[in-house]
């Protein structure tokens, strides 16, 4: 299965910057604490925690830092009264956008999310307005350089659902989200070194963006990710190589 414009299409990835990394770490720690508080500290019995651990390690968080976060959650961190909130909406060019938040104040969060949509020509939708276009999956990513057949055989043996090979040679292995950790363990044991592993929302359809709407979508994503309450942003925007070259 071939793919194209990987990072522009499935989930916007910005260049790593020190300030951005600090914000990413804060958000990952918040997710680790919440996942451990809600489901316990054993990643083998808590898929949400295992996914958060994989994401933390993919972002080079130290074991000491993530273990302290888990301990806070298991210990019933009194300061952590966060709840997961999912917002849905339409972005520039008719793109479907899902915004995953962890917040202790719904009013603040929805105000920030709505502002981002409004400023970029989109609109916040109701529950179910676009979620039917996305499927929750585990994604294990490999950098270019691996043989497709090697990864395919190992992935199928490990119980993965599918793999996607991109034009640049990068490979994504897709799993049921609850099986992400178990599949990754099997792939790790074969010697395949993953570049990242996370739970993601995968769109079933794509919305092609032109040179006018693509920058607006990227601005929407930037505004949303700048909110401390926003954990992840998913969309179905398709940005061609030709359009990307103009950005």
From Swiss-Prot:
Keywords: Cytoplasm, DNA-binding, Transcription, Transcription regulation
Broad class of where this protein is predominantly found: cytoplasm
Coiled coil: none
InterPro entries the UniProt entry points to: Integrase-like_N (IPR017856), TACO1_YebC-like_2nd/3rd_dom (IPR048300), TACO1_YebC_N (IPR049083), Transcrip_reg_TACO1-like (IPR002876), Transcrip_reg_TACO1-like_dom3 (IPR026564), YebC-like (IPR029072)
Pfam families documented for this protein: TACO1_YebC_N, Transcrip_reg
Transmembrane parts of this sequence: none
Compartments, as annotated in UniProt: Cytoplasm
Molecular function as annotated in GO: DNA binding
One GO process term, biological-process aspect: regulation of DNA-templated transcription
Organism superkingdom: Bacteria
Any Gene Ontology CC annotation: cytosol
Family: Belongs to the TACO1 family.
HAMAP family attached to this UniProt entry: Transcrip_reg_TACO1
Protein name per its UniProtKB record: Probable transcriptional regulatory protein YPK_2146
Organism from which the protein derives: Yersinia pseudotuberculosis serotype O:3 (strain YPIII)
């Amino acid at each position: 299965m071939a793919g194209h414009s990987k990072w522009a299409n499935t989930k916007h990835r910005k260049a790593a910057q020190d300030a951005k990394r600090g914000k990413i770490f804060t958000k990952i720690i918040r997710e680790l604490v919440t996942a451990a508080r809600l489901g316990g500290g054993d990643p083998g019995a808590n898929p949400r925690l295992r996914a958060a651990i994989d994401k933390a390690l993919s972002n080079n968080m130290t074991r000491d830092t993530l273990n302290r976060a888990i301990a806070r959650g298991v210990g019933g961190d009194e300061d952590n009264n966060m709840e997961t909130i999912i917002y849905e909406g339409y972005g520039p060019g008719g793109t479907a956008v899902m915004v995953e938040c962890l917040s202790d104040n719904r009013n603040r969060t929805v105000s920030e999310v709505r502002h981002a949509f409004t400023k970029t020509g989109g609109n916040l939708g109701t529950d179910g307005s676009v979620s039917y276009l996305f499927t929750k999956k585990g994604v294990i990513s490999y950098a270019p350089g691996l043989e497709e057949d090697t990864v395919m055989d190992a992935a199928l043996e490990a119980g993965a659902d599918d793999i996607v090979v991109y034009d640049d040679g990068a490979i994504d292995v897709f799993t049921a989200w609850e099986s992400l950790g178990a599949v990754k363990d099997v792939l790790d044991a074969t010697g395949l070194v993953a570049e990242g592993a996370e739970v993601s929302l995968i769109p079933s359809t794509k919305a092609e963006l032109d040179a006018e709407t693509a920058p607006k979508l990227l601005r929407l994503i930037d505004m949303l990710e700048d909110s401390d309450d926003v954990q992840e942003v998913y969309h179905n925007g398709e940005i061609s190589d030709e359009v990307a070259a103009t950005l």
